[in-house]
Amino acid sequence: MKTSMQAKLDQLTTRLAELNDLLSREDITSNIDQYRKLTREHAELQPVVEQYGLWRQTMNDAATAQELLSDASMKDFAEEEIRASRERMETLESELQKMLLPKDPNDDRNIFLEIRAGTGGDESALFAGDLLRMYLRYAERNRWQVEMMSASESDLGGYKEVIVRIAGEAAYSKLKFESGGHRVQRVPATETQGRIHTSACTVAVMPEADEIGEVEINPADLRIDTFRASGAGGQHINKTDSAVRVTHLPTGIVVECQDDRSQHKNKDRALKVLAARIKDKQYHEQHAKEAATRKSLIGSGDRSERIRTYNFPQGRLTDHRINLTLYRLESIMEGDLDELIAALVSEHQAELLASLGDAD
């Protein structure tokens, strides 16, 4: 293990001991905000320090076995013990490296998932509906909560654009690599000649901004229009101006919400989506220079970048960023995304490790 890495782990071990002392103090436990902050830090450090403890114990086992080599009757046992200990130390060190990787501050946030139909007309809108269903099934598997924020349905079903809020543990960390262009190849229901058509949708995954102060929005920068909701009809449709369109004048970002009968609720939802879009725009602008100097294999999350192809005739999904092909499209469209997401996370971790190695 590198000296710098061991020094860092020693610092974390000391800090965990400090936290144990702090969390037992009455003045800390009576301060709810401070107590929560320290408890969160403790929860992050404890598994790292425990892993480091296993590494040190294994190193001590190897040192003890080394001393036995001079004893002829114990030599074979000692050599096997040394070999096993070194293998275990390598595994533990590799795991520790991943645990020390810089944590994305957005990983624990809830998200807004936006799907837009692209090229392909009605078929693209139908595929947008299929993608939404896939993500909703995945959310169910993770016991996340889903709230429809805005939906613009197409004439034949599916969506021209749809935005949902997904709330739950690690939602952003698991879905953040879904941003980009998703291409579908299949025979549309309206195709009489059996020809395969290609269409596309774009997906954007945006971390939800904090309620207070994270994204400053000056009310003077907003234009808020109300209009009558459009939809499939019904007694409440088009009788009141409940739909809301919010335009952020400095950026030109426009958000429409009309799913609720309450204008107030639609406005509140639109402002939440707007804050997430502004935060997302700021994030990508900040990382533009870095992306230009070191092109990430996973990609920047730019929705114009084609990241994946869904080939229905072959039952095949291909993620172009990591050259991964899976021949179980049916289960994937039912929300079985674990293998795919794990592969993307693993590749991202490998990239981070490589970049840290370059920095050393």
From Swiss-Prot:
PANTHER family in the record: LD18447P
Native source species: Paraburkholderia phymatum (strain DSM 17167 / CIP 108236 / LMG 21445 / STM815) (Burkholderia phymatum)
Locations listed in the record: Cytoplasm
PTM summary: Methylated by PrmC. Methylation increases the termination efficiency of RF1.
Known role: Peptide chain release factor 1 directs the termination of translation in response to the peptide chain termination codons UAG and UAA.
Domain of life: Bacteria
Main location: cytoplasm
Record's protein name: Peptide chain release factor 1
Keyword Nucleotide-binding: no
Gene Ontology terms for molecular function: translation release factor activity, codon specific
Family: Belongs to the prokaryotic/mitochondrial release factor family.
NCBIfam families: prfA (TIGR00019), PRK00591.1 (NF001859)
Modified residue annotations for N5-methylglutamine: 235
Entry GO terms, CC: cytoplasm
